[in-house]
């Protein structure tokens, strides 16, 4: 969801995408990887196949030390997906792309762990602590930004999102999102959150990817760009900011054109 922010820049070189990780739950990141399912090769899109493979291999954690960046932006919209969990503690995200490959998600003794369940929460919190400690060890925790967004309840013309998303589903998802944001806020300062008026989190009826509770009106993306630009300028003024390394639901790893090293 955060990736769409960059499409609304007037100056496309101001915020530059270094890397992008999607369809990967933080709950999956904190667990052991499953064996790569042969069905993954059925995913025709190279981008979508790579996205699924990165989740299964936990590439994000392995890549963290190898990228130079100014900001690491995460959002929790992809936490809406269920998980596939094997008895040995191996986990992956049951994204739509993985399920479309023919992966059943209930084979080899594994089972589905539903979003919003307490088991999901336990795995998610464990994953968050692993990500948090990794960023601390690399000295880049201050580069982390959390895009604190919620599912919208209405479209810009007053419509709802049924039959795909009911009001009850939206309310429940937002309650769980709020629980996750509250947990993260225990570990990082409020200045590292991007926060928005709820009116901006209204569903666009002309969004590139269609109508959805998390495909917002243009005003949201403009507000996000303003906050990201301000955060990037602040990070560049910080002592030693040009020397830090590392990357990043869906984490976005961004650099700023003002940083000559990037």
Predicted regions and their residues:
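Short catalytic/ligand-binding loop motif for oxyanion handling, primarily in non-cytosolic enzymes
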Residues: 1-5, 80-85, 152-158, 201-206
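Basic, amphipathic N-terminal segments that precede the first structured/catalytic domain
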Residues: 1-71, 206, 228-242, 249-254
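A basic- and aromatic-enriched beta-loop-alpha substructure that forms the phosphate/nucleotide-
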Residues: 38-113
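Surface-exposed cleft-lining segments at the edges of enzyme active sites
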Residues: 43-47, 81, 98-129, 159-171, ...
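Well-ordered, non-membrane alpha-helical segments in soluble/globular domains
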Residues: 56-58, 117-133, 167-182, 218-222
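A structural motif corresponding to the C-terminal end of an alpha-helix
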Residues: 126-145, 179-194
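Acidic carboxylate-rich catalytic motifs and surrounding loops in phosphoryl-/glycosyl-chemistry enzymes
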Residues: 146-150, 189-207, 240
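Substrate-gating cap/lid alpha-helix
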Residues: 154-195
């Amino acid at each position: 969801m955060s990736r769409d922010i960059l499409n609304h820049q007037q100056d496309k070189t101001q915020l530059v995408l270094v890397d992008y990780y999607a369809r990967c739950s933080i709950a999956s990141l904190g667990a052991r990887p499953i064996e790569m399912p042969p069905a993954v090769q059925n995913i025709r899109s190279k981008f979508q196949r790579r996205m699924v493979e990165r989740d299964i291999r936990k590439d994000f954690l392995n890549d963290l030390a190898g990228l130079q960046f100014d900001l690491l932006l995460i959002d929790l919209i992809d936490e809406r997906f269920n998980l596939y969990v094997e008895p040995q503690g191996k986990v992956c995200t049951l994204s739509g792309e993985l399920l479309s490959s023919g992966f059943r998600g209930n084979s080899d003794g594994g089972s589905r762990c539903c979003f919003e369940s307490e088991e999901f929460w336990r795995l998610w919190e464990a994953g968050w602590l692993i990500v948090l400690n990794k960023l601390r060890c690399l000295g880049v925790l201050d580069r982390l930004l959390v895009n604190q967004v919620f599912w919208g309840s209405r479209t810009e013309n007053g419509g709802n999102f049924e039959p795909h998303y009911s009001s009850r589903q939206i309310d429940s998802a937002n309650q769980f999102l709020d629980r996750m944001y509250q947990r993260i806020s225990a570990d990082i300062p409020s200045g590292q959150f991007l926060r928005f008026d709820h009116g901006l989190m209204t569903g666009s009826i002309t969004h590139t990817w269609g109508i959805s509770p998390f495909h917002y009106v243009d005003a949201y993306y403009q507000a996000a760009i303003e906050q990201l630009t301000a955060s990037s300028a602040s990070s560049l003024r910080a002592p030693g900011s040009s020397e830090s390394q590392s990357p990043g639901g869906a984490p976005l790893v961004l650099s700023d054109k003002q940083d000559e090293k990037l």
